[in-house]
Amino acid sequence: MDPRLPETDLVIFDCDGVLVDSEALSCRCLAEAMVRAGIEISTEQVLELFLGRSTAALVDYCRGVGKPLPATFLPELALDVRETFRARLKPIAGIAAVLAELRLPYCVASSSDLERVKFSLELTGLAPSFGQRLYTAQMVKQ
């Protein structure tokens, strides 16, 4: 090992944008849902405003622009995202090879909910690489 580098005990992967190419798909779904709810916004604006942010940030933004979200918004968005992922989600190019060659312990830590992380990894064939080594914001006290 290179003495100039710190010793590594564990590799922690984020899911969205690191293991699976989901960010653009999710943001496109969100932008389309917001437009349907009467909020004019582009996918690029959604990427800038909400990527990596919580649902609370989305709700606050919509209230701030005078368009509170209907009760059906989030469940419908979740369905749209799942359908889009089923049709188009892919692993990040080369990540399966990286995981196959990695000789260190590794896991996933994500701000996405556990169901979405599992779904994404299963769709892309990456789930067996991680087993139960999945950690999400839901598991951490704020």
PLM feature spans:
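Short helix-capping segments at alpha-helix termini
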Residues: 36-40, 65-72, 125-129
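Metal-dependent phosphoesterase signature
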Residues: 60-96
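Substrate-recognition "cap/lid" segment bordering the active-site pocket of phosphatases
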Residues: 107, 113-142
